[in-house]
């Protein structure tokens, strides 16, 4: 007798996702499980059929072979539908469905849960110069390591952990809830399958101790605020042989007294005197490489921006550099002597006749005023 199509068995389309397949199987398994239908041969066959279909369609490799070649593409030894092995318990039928809820897959007694270690984050503050040029920094991070006294067993030297009497070493226990026999983490050993009657005095039975670890961090030139550097394997160690987590170093750049950063560009104010702005001249300005000279043309107005190309910050992902933007600030003189005040009064007096020619913004402003009152 030929087998029915697995998608037809579960009542799903061929493009159904994992969640839809799992939901369909769960519905059929609850309906036809032998624990609920002890005297029904038909229910037994339908349960076996649904289970076989689910074991193929829930496995990406088997599903791919089935989609290409049909039943002939699925190795019978991997199908899991043979009747000679007997039936699993109700919770075992739903092991992968309830695994996320109750800490592990059903039917896997005796296996300790393996977990990846937690990731760590370290906030590192650096100067703008260090961000621009790159740097190497030494940091100390809190971590946990295997206890050197008990070598990770958690037991006092000369003693050994014992098999948990509650779960018999399985790490999980079954709880009957109506029709369901649910498997969950053992409350006594917390899933390890062992208990420690005589804990290690240095780690308190944890098998791990807190330490400070020194690490060299290489900061690439051009790194920006909030960027993170990943150091694989420098997080907390895994559990039961699991891989360690990662360390993420998050960069924070201190405020600079002169420069403000905008991506790869730098901005700074460039104060100049009233006379230099009017007559022109040459002044020194700071850059990250040192002082540079810049020519100020006559009649320069406050707010004008001078761009120094390539004097910004190197892009962290390329060899290009940003620019340095110098914003002119014409300073009003203060603490004037009587002679200086007298000269300014003379300048004001001789400028009265053609003030608009000497003050372009004032001329523009007066034009707006005249237009306003003319309407």
UniProtKB/Swiss-Prot annotation:
GO terms for molecular function: ATP binding; heat shock protein binding; unfolded protein binding; zinc ion binding. PANTHER family: CHAPERONE PROTEIN DNAJ (PTHR43096:SF48), DNAJ HOMOLOG 1, MITOCHONDRIAL-RELATED (PTHR43096). Its cofactor is Zn(2+). This is Chaperone protein DnaJ. The J domain is necessary and sufficient to stimulate DnaK ATPase activity. Zinc center 1 plays an important role in the autonomous, DnaK-independent chaperone activity of DnaJ. Zinc center 2 is essential for interaction with DnaK and for DnaJ activity. A zinc finger (CR-type) spans 134-212. Belongs to the DnaJ family. Residues 5-70 form the J domain. SUPFAM superfamilies: Chaperone J-domain (SSF46565), DnaJ/Hsp40 cysteine-rich domain (SSF57938), HSP40/DnaJ peptide-binding domain (SSF49493). Homodimer. GO terms for biological process: chaperone cofactor-dependent protein refolding; DNA replication; protein refolding; response to heat.
């Amino acid at each position: 007798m030929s087998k029915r199509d697995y998608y037809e068995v579960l009542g799903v389309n061929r493009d159904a996702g994992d969640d839809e397949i799992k939901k369909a199987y769960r519905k059929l398994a609850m309906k036809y499980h032998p624990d609920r239908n002890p005297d029904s041969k038909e229910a037994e066959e339908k349960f076996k059929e649904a289970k076989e279909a689910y074991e193929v369609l829930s496995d990406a490799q088997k599903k791919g072979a089935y989609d290409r070649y049909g039943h002939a593409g699925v190795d019978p030894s991997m199908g899991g539908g043979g009747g000679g092995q007997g039936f699993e318990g109700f919770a075992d039928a739903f092991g992968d469905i309830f695994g996320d809820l109750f800490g592990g897959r059903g039917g896997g007694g005796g296996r300790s849960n393996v977990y990846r270690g937690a990731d760590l984050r370290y906030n590192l503050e650096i100067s703008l110069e260090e961000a621009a040029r790159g740097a190497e920094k030494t940091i100390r991070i809190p971590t946990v390591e295997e206890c050197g006294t008990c070598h990770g067993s958690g037991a006092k030297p000369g003693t050994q952990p014992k098999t948990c009497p509650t779960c018999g070493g399985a790490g999980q226990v079954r709880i009957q809830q109506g029709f369901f026999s649910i498997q969950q983490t053992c409350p006594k050993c917390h899933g390890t399958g062992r208990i420690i009657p005589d804990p290690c005095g240095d780690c308190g039975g944890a098998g791990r101790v807190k330490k400070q670890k020194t690490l060299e961090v290489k900061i690439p030139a051009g790194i920006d605020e909030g960027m993170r550097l990943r150091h694989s394997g420098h997080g907390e160690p895994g559990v039961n042989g699991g891989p360690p987590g990662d360390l993420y170093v998050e960069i924070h750049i201190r405020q600079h007294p002169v420069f403000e950063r905008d991506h790869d560009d730098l901005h700074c104010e460039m104060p100049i005197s009233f006379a230099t702005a009017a007559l022109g001249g040459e002044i020194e300005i700071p850059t990250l490489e040192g002082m540079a000279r810049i020519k100020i043309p006559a009649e320069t107005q406050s707010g004008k921006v001078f761009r120094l190309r390539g004097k910004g910050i190197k892009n962290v992902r390329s060899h290009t550099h940003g620019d340095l933007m110098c914003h002119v600030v014409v300073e009003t003189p203060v603490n004037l002597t009587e002679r200086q005040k007298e000269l300014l009064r003379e300048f004001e007096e001789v400028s009265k006749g053609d003030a608009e020619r000497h003050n372009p913004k004032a001329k523009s402003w007066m034009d707006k005023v005249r237009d306003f009152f003319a309407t």
